[in-house]
Amino acid sequence: VSRNKISPTFLVFAITFLPSLVAANDELWNCGTATVCITPQQPMTMAGYASRGEKHATDTLNDLWAKTLILEDASNRRAVLVTLDLLGIDRKLSQRICKSIMEKHGLDRSQIAICSSHTHSGPVVAGTLRPMHALHFNESNLNLTLEYSEFLKQSIEDCVDQAFETLAPSSLSWGSGSATFATNRRNNTEKNIPKLRASGKLAGPYDHDVPVLMVRQDGKMKAIVFGYACHCTVLSGFEWSGDYAGFAQSELEDLYPGCVAMFWAGCGGDQNPLPRRKVELARRYGSHLAHAVSQVIEGSTHDLSPELQTSYREVDIAFGTLPTRDELQAQSASQNRYEAARARSLIEQIDSGQELSPTYPYPIQFWNLGDEINWFFLGGEVVVDYALSIKSNHGETNADLTDVWCTAYANDVMAYIPSRRVLLEGGYEGGGAMIYYGLPTIWDETVESTILDTVHQLINER
């Protein structure tokens, strides 16, 4: 009878190297990615600018995409990140999409984040900016919007399903860079921007951070997730486009073949890419942003251990004094067609037996990655004051590194979210835009403290 003998050399190898191999495997995440094109397949109306009316897009400058990244840590805890080259989606559509994903993949609400780039060169999605768009549409355009919204829902769900099918061992790392084209549009006159920038006299506040998350599989770049706090409003024509963010994603995918580049919009509700209105500028800003991301990738980055925590809360943020039915009746005769449309819609709501709510259920989501990155997802068009406050109070920030990430336009784009300062100053972000979103009045002065108190609670509960 022969016996297999274990050589002394193998024993030395096993004792020396196997523990480290097991440890290395413990340091890996499982990640999956997928992309689905969501460019409308037929001409339809475009979102974001009332001046476009019901005129349809005529061509495609660059395609629009839904993209998904699945993160799974060493304890099999999962998170689903979806990015969309769209202006935004509303609460109802977001809930429907999340419900389907939760049921199919056994997730809870905290594990799904849906982030819109806020491009103003995408299609109108049902439920968003109704007094600006849908309340004025003819039947044909309204049906196109409803059909596209169902197509979008299915596309997102398909994208998530496909990403789950590609889960594989991955390493995660992160860093942060800077890009400087975002400009505070409230405190700088657009025509003076070139001169102010050249003289170093642009007024703030602003947030020029570019957070970057890198996913590698077998040493190859699989996904790049990055954010920036600036409106996607370089373009205002009639071609589908992801604007500067779309160009940035395309350039990164060319630089790193085989990877999926995903953009999320930060707290740039009061930030514009200036100057603008030329395709050349959208390409230039996209290249500027892609270069900032690639510098992070090629520089010093930080590995993330496979630890994931997720939480989600909806907090009631208060409106100011609600209008009476008589006041709405008067507004319904306004020469401002958008104010009149909002008033008629709210009157219909009241007459159907649904009183105007004094609050709105505002979504706040928190992910912690590797016990290093504190990542907040806020709904609506959030002004920059929020990001600066959250980073100041909850992060370790210096000139080269930002470990607190603040995504806006996430899960529900219901309105502008002004800070108390901006609310009291007034103007478009301070309250004027509420008309276009169909909400009954401006926010109460407690809006900022309510949101930031909840942010504080979520980070302290982890």
Kindly give the residue locations of the regions a language model identified:
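Short linear motifs centered on Gly/Pro in flexible linkers and helix caps
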Residues: 1, 21-22
